[in-house]
Amino acid sequence: MKLYNSASRKKEDFVPNHPDIVKMYTCGPTVYHFAHIGNLRSYIMEDVLEKYLRYAGYNVKRVMNITDVGHLTSDADEGEDKMLKGAKREHKSVMEIAKFYTDAFFSDCKKLNIKTPDVVEPATNCIDEYIKIITKLMDTGYAYFAGGNVYFDTSKLERYYIFNDFNADDLDVGVREGVEEDVNKRNKNDFVLWFTKSKFEDQALKWDSPWGVGYPGWHIECSGISMKHLGEDLDIHCGGIDNAFPHHTNEIAQSESYLGHKWCNYWMHVLHLNTNSGKMSKSKGEFLTVSLLEDKGYDPLAYRLFCLQSHYRKSLVFSWENLDNAQGTYNKLINRIAALKPAGEAVDEDAVAALKSKFTAALDNDLNTSLAVTALYDVLKYDTNDDTKLAVIADFDRVLSLSLIEKADARRAELKKQAVSGTSEFTVISESGESDAGIEALLKARANAKKAKNFAEADRIRDELKAQGIEVTDIPNGAKWKRI
């Protein structure tokens, strides 16, 4: 298995630190607002990664934080705590805001079939861990106290910019409009490890510390939570491209200065979901939620499929037209699987091996989900019995998590119910997924002839299709066809 490592800027063979476990850390949401579908693209990719590692036989422990304090509006050290901003917006307490939007986040994840990580830790639970790390950084000269805050001194590092090949447009960093720069820093890139009350008098959440009553910076939270649950080394750290700088850069700086050795081996970043006006962003007030997609009639799993059809290291352009296409593709996929007829036949193990080789080759190549979806379509076209196809589809869906078998079973039951009531519409399914209006018209004409008991005409149409190299199979309330 090869993964693209953002730190080395190349694909590398994946070799975990320990043979018995893969340690995986995911930057979780800042729970001051709903997650937008661009945020959720990252969590979909991370979900696929975890599930594929398990599929490949690894034992995985995945940890994710919930940021409920310390994440400022600049994404660096300037501005207001986002949690306080959310509380003011909705006239609620910070903890009320945190609980509501944490619950909303996991509700969205459930709709998208995103597995809950093994450990989910709110940042406010780990204050002692942050103080322990900061104290050692102060003692070893990597941190200093100024203006009421504790800062990490980036001038002490031989190398600070780890991900500096990213374009500025990709990273979207810099001081945002209306945000004042911190004049207490010795160096431009220094960052806050601990804020005291001297910074924000109205900060809602504060704790005692050796440096005064205050609260942790955003970056120290992920280091502390990761070390608490995963120890002093880490295999994979994931996040959106926005996290690469300054957040992940600062995590590496403080963690490796504290530990005295390399902290994480593989860094993986998901690129933006863009709209016609640019990157989807809560700070700009331009974002779409899973609930909004549902209100417009879309299945959240159609959005998951939309994400899987593109590689995670490519920017993905969202439009309603593109989502319409994904929903149509998803519906057709479910219909094609529903047209398969389980008959209790033996599974063809040779076919399984051939089909799985394409699927695993795709995902072994830096999680190429686009080719993995193509491998799924190959199953439907493969010359083997339907029981084998259904078994392989169920196997692939352990990773893709599109609820393919469940949705197909429901569709099959719906068609049978419609057949009994006589309210069903005739469904035409192409086994290859292609669309041909002429063939569909002939199949519907044949169905009408059969309904009128004009079997001679129905047979004539079947013969006409056969002469065109089309094989027809009748299914409940429809027909499926393929070229032979």
Task: Annotate each language-model stretch with its function.
Residues 1-32, 47, 107, 127-341:
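Alpha-helical recognition segments enriched in aromatics with Gly/Pro capping
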Residues 8, 17-113, 477-481:
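N-terminal, positively charged nucleic-acid-binding surface of large information/translation enzymes
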Residues 54, 138, 466:
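Anion (oxyanion) recognition and catalysis
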Residues 59-61, 141-147, 383, 471-473:
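Short, well-structured beta-strand/strand-turn elements
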Residues 63-69, 98-105, 115-130, 148-157:
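Short, glycine/charge-rich beta-strand/loop segments that flank catalytic centers
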Residues 87-93, 119-124, 212, 240:
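The substrate-binding groove and active-site-proximal loops of carbohydrate-active enzymes
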Residues 279-281, 287-484:
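Structural preference for alpha-helix termini/caps and helix-kink/transition segments
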